[in-house]
Amino acid sequence: MLSKNQQKLLRALAQKKYRKQHGLYLVQGAKNVQELLNAGKPVKQIFASADFIAANRALLEPHELVLCDEAELSKVSTLVSNNAAIAIAETEPQAELNTSGLVLALDDVSDPGNLGTIIRVADWYGLRQIVLSEHSADHLNPKVISATMGSFARVDVIRTDLCTLLSTYDGPVYGAFLEGQSVHATSFATRGILVMGSESHGISAAVAEHINQPITIPAFGGAESLNVAMATGIILDNMKRHG
């Protein structure tokens, strides 16, 4: 059963200021909690239904566990439907950026759903790190974690000033624009940085100054634009096939 203090903490961690204050974040739903545990991430506490505990006993064994009924879990979860498990995980120190291979950098991508999907896409294509500009969405937002479908546990997120990073980088910097060289005709290097811009404004002018390989996804129909997560997947697919 959830105590009042536990309920209060779970609700508080839906907000960025309390995640930062406590150094904790929420992982919700059976799939995401399983991925969290499989990755060996630091966990403070797990709240779970009897069915989830029975199905994941070995994974849960080392952790502090609170048995809850499904109604309790649904009541405190930020998800529309979650009656299996919620974990309180500990925020880890930011990883060191590795620029020896392909790096994906997001310039002010502010929509949590898009960011979560991009993390999932990056995981699909084998990227172990993503760089976020300082004004991109919080990658520990519950909506982001949920949208990753477990990929948050395998992809490190590094938040930094993109202009500073790009100004000292000595490899190709690809940027997605409405105009540029077609991704189908670009010979991608195995080492490089791909910059994707925000949903509403694209790549900022300050960041664009550091891009030396502007690229575009050619359109064959009448749609005005592509969702940034969809566009990221298309470009990464071309980079992996031609790089």
Q: What residue spans do the PLM features occupy?
A:
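Glycine- and other small-residue-rich loops at beta-strand/loop junctions that grip anionic moieties
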Residues: 25, 107-108, 133-134, 220, ...
